Amino acid sequence: MLSGRLVPGLVSMAGRVCLCQGSAGSGAVGPVEAAIRTKLEQALSPEVLELRNESGGHAVPPGSETHFRVAVVSSRFEGLSPLQRHRLIHAALAEELAGPVHALAIQARTPAQWGENSQLDTSPPCLGGNKKTLGTP
């Protein structure tokens, strides 16, 4: 079941579902986010692809594209361990991970696993950045 907060960014891709949140929730999609989406679509032909730019919740300049969360549902994951699934995603995004992307949280499921639990993970608040803003002396 798709949560209501994601439906405004719903995009159809040839019978697949792509949930897009835009750059840090702004609705705009930046070049890194667009490249990530394109590469994952090409490499994994996902049935569901959710990509969130979570950079806005971190100590980075506004408009940054450094922290992402991705949920990928693909039949390519059948018979693969979670580590093997993550390696497929990392291989597809090698250029981004070597450059602008600092953090990538991954949910990689088969269609059957998604059918059993379509709950999307959420990220905890950022604890990095300027410690003075976190109440530490």
From Swiss-Prot:
Intracellular or extracellular location(s): Mitochondrion
Main location: mitochondrion
Chain positions found as Phosphoserine: 81
Gene3D superfamilies for this protein: BolA-like
Membrane-spanning ranges: none
UniProt keyword terms in alphabetical order: Mitochondrion, Phosphoprotein
Keyword hit for Phosphoprotein: yes
Residue runs in coiled coils: none
Region (Disordered): 114-137
Keyword Phosphoprotein listed: yes
Family in the record: Belongs to the BolA/IbaG family.
Quaternary assembly: Interacts with GLRX5.
Stated role: Acts as a mitochondrial iron-sulfur (Fe-S) cluster assembly factor that facilitates (Fe-S) cluster insertion into a subset of mitochondrial proteins. Probably acts together with the monothiol glutaredoxin GLRX5. May protect cells against oxidative stress.
Protein name as it appears in the record: BolA-like protein 1
